[in-house]
Every structure is written in structure tokens, then in C-alpha cells.
From Swiss-Prot:
Membrane topology: Multi-pass membrane protein
Family: Belongs to the cytochrome b family.
Organism: Lionycteris spurrelli (Chestnut long-tongued bat)
Gene Ontology BP terms: mitochondrial electron transport, ubiquinol to cytochrome c
Entry function: Component of the ubiquinol-cytochrome c reductase complex (complex III or cytochrome b-c1 complex) that is part of the mitochondrial respiratory chain. The b-c1 complex mediates electron transfer from ubiquinol to cytochrome c. Contributes to the generation of a proton gradient across the mitochondrial membrane that is then used for ATP synthesis.
The gene coding this protein: MT-CYB
Species classification: Eukaryota, Metazoa, Chordata, Craniata, Vertebrata
Cofactor dependency: heme b
Listed name of the protein: Cytochrome b
CDD domains referenced in this protein's UniProt entry, alphabetically: cytochrome_b_C, Cytochrome_b_N
Example GO molecular function: metal ion binding
Amino acid sequence: MTNIRKTHPLLKILNSSFVDLPAPSNLSAWWNFGSLLGVCLALQILTGLFLAMHYTADTATAFNSVTHICRDVNYGWLLRYLHANGASMFFICLYIHVGRGLYYGSYTYTETWNVGILLLFAVMATAFMGYVLPWGQMSFWGATVITNLLSAIPYIGTELVQWIWGGFSVDKATLTRFFAFHFLFPFIVTALVMVHLLFLHETGSNNPTGIPSDPDMIPFHPYYTIKDILGFLMMLTVLSALVLFSPDLLGDPDNYTPANPLNTPPHIKPEWYFLFAYAILRSIPNKLGGVLALVLSILILAVVPALHMSKQRSMMFRPLSQCLFWLLVATLLTLTWIGGQPVEYPYVIIGQVASVLYFMILLVLMPLISIVENKLLKW
């Protein structure tokens, strides 16, 4: 008798995606982060759903409803901090996942890569809107500053900002629509994840060597299912430690003050996972230029496949490119630090140098070094 998982219309789709899927035999731990992102998404949707049952999207009661969740709802504090710190874990996994793709040349699967960029934008938009919902000081002023950036768009900017706000300032209408979109977006992300996997399974996974792995494949289950479960346990251990021991470590104390349009906080800054982009935005003195640089800091990933000059796919055997890759990582960490600092000497100049270096590495240095490496190998 044929196994039901191979004949049932629904089960056979799952079977070909997670059970009998042929996978390269040499995938390292860097390949765990895709499945970890899936777990993060599921966790965020679940905790978010239960939080939404108690949250009220109204300027008069939003802050108090979050306090009520933490104090009066059974395990509400756990839901709230799992959701807030789950977002941080989500972005840690996202950035490592993208970094893995850059390092091992996975971006040569252009469809999968481009859907991934869309996913990155969607998750960033979702996180931004979620940060506004507790209606603390940083929620309100973060929303005001970031949405106001759209006013830099020539001709339609001001109207566009007021259209998004639903009035002449960030107010009740803004909070309500942000809640609606924050609820909707994770489901759009889930749909995009399916498309991402669909394109990935058209080609099969890349592997650390960057060499076609067709002659040496193993079934996904049990080899990579057990490996993924180990990854889940490790990530959930870190998340649990964060939630139970220092839940506010990654948050901003200003967000424990209710939103007040008449009092601007001394340092307006987004959550830590947006600081690198915020630093790039601030490093350009012109408003429109800053906004363009902000968008391009992520959109630049779309041109990476076109700039791949090496005859080898992966950086595994390219030590010069490896040095540049880790310089890029150091640059991003520097930008993240700068984004959280006040706009004064020496932080401004450090941010400007790091911003230029970030774009230089991706657009100029990496293609050049790839050509040099080809020459060194007499290719």
C-alpha cells in the first residue's frame, strides 16, 4: 500500500517540502535560520493574536490597555514580552539569514532572493507599525518622525503624509490604521514566505561550497528536521532567558511614558534593529537624500546578483572577499551603534564614513576584489 503522505493531495505537498525533499548533505548551521524565521513568524502571529484580544487601538486607552495586559491578564506580561523580544529574535535571524545569502552566493537564485527582499521590507514595515501601538513617547515620536520623511517626496509629499496620518498630525486615525495594518501584514508575510519557498524548491538549496550538490543529496527528514529542532530549542532558550530575566533590555525607557505631543524626548530613535538604517538616514544633511539613502540601504540587495563578478559562487574559497564581508558586518555594527548616539561630534563623522563605506563595499569593492581573485586564479 502506498504511504498516505505521498498520495493525499495536501499531505504530498507537505511531504515534498519537508519530508522527502532532497537536500545537500553538507548544509552548515547557517542554514538553520530559515526555519528559525518560520518559528519566529508563528510565535509572533500567535502572541500577537492573543494580545489583540485585549488591546484597544484608541489614543485615550492604548497605553492603559498595554498596562492592563501586563498587570491583569493571565500571563499577559509573558505574551507582551514574548512578542516584543520575539521581534528582536526575528530580526537577528533575518540579518543572519541575509548575511548567509551574501556570503555563500545564494543571491544567484534571483527569484528567491527578490522575494526575500520583499519579505524584509514587509517585516520591517510590520515591526515599525507594531512599535507605534503601545502609544508611549517613543511610539508617538517615532511614528511622527518616520512618517514625516515621506514629506521629502517632491510635489505630493505633504499630501501623502497627511493621507497616511488621516489628519494633520499623528492621532487616533493613525493609531487605528496602524493597528489594522499591523494585524494584516503578518499574513501577507506568510503568503510571501510560501512564494519564497516555492521558488527555492524550484532550484533546490545552495550549499557552503557553492558547487552543485545534485550527486550528493540526503532526505530532509530525519537529518535536517532534527537539526532544525536543535536550532529551535537553542533560539527559544535565548528568547526565554531574555523574556524572563531582562525583558526591557532591548526596549526604550521613554516608551513607559504615555505619548505626549507637547513634549519631545531628547533622543528620538527607533528600535535597535533599525538603527543602522537610521544612522544612514541621519548621515546625509539633505532630507530627500537621507530618505533615498535609507531606502537604498535595503534596496541595494537587489543589485547584488548583477554585481557578482566572481567565477566562484560561494566566498568559502575566496579569502579577500571574506575580509570585505566581515568589514561589511563591522560597518553595519558601527552604524547600529551610531544610530543610537546623539547628533554631535564625533558621532556624525563616524556615521558618514561608515555609510559611505557600506555602499562602497557592496557596489564597488566586492566586484573589484572578485575580479582580482579571478585573475589570481588565472581564470
